[in-house]
Amino acid sequence: MLVSNHQGYMDILVLGSLDPASFVGKAEIRWWPIFGLFSWWAGTIFLERRNKTALKGPLHETINRLREGGRVVVFPEGTDSDGTGVLPFHSSFFEAAIRAQCPVIPVAIRYSAPGVSSREEVIYWKDRRFLPHLIRLLGVGGIRAQVTFGKPMEPGSDRKALARRVYGEVARMVRVGGAT
């Protein structure tokens, strides 16, 4: 299971280009024009974020995919951020790694582009509208995505403790960059 910070839709394109993986994503994406269809085709595990009782199905699907040897990417911040740090992790999906006895690989993504603020021009966060952001993004040249993979972590038996350990490593990698 890959666990990454999240700065917007570019993260999915970047991580998806490196290795085939399923993503855990918010359920409303399923109904977005074009993206919903691509998400479904790509095997996204849809999660109803505001309904804790609806977590059981996506959690079991994640466990099954991990047990079958699949890669699943989770963004436990639960939303995208501005890239200046890492938001607190929600611990629910760390239970999947524990039940599947699957190592967790911390991942940090950072963006840069010459002459522009990646926070303002590259990262898609907060209440930005998609189409204006995409149009501006297409005009930015030389965007660099730095992806840093941490060492696999054994899950142990406590999802909250696992979430804290992985959070610490992802936050450290975001701060310092490092080998990719």
Map each language-model feature to its residues:
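Residue-level preference for the first positions of well-ordered beta-strands
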Residues: 1, 44, 71-75, 103, ...
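Catalytic core of membrane glycerolipid acyltransferases/transacylases, capturing the structured
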Residues: 1-52
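A cross-family acyltransferase "interaction/gating" segment
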Residues: 34-37, 51, 84-165, 176
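Anion (oxyanion) recognition and catalysis
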Residues: 40, 66, 98
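A membrane-cytosol interface segment of integral membrane proteins
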Residues: 43-66, 71
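Catalytic-site beta-strand/loop segments enriched in glycine and acidic/polar residues
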Residues: 65-94, 179
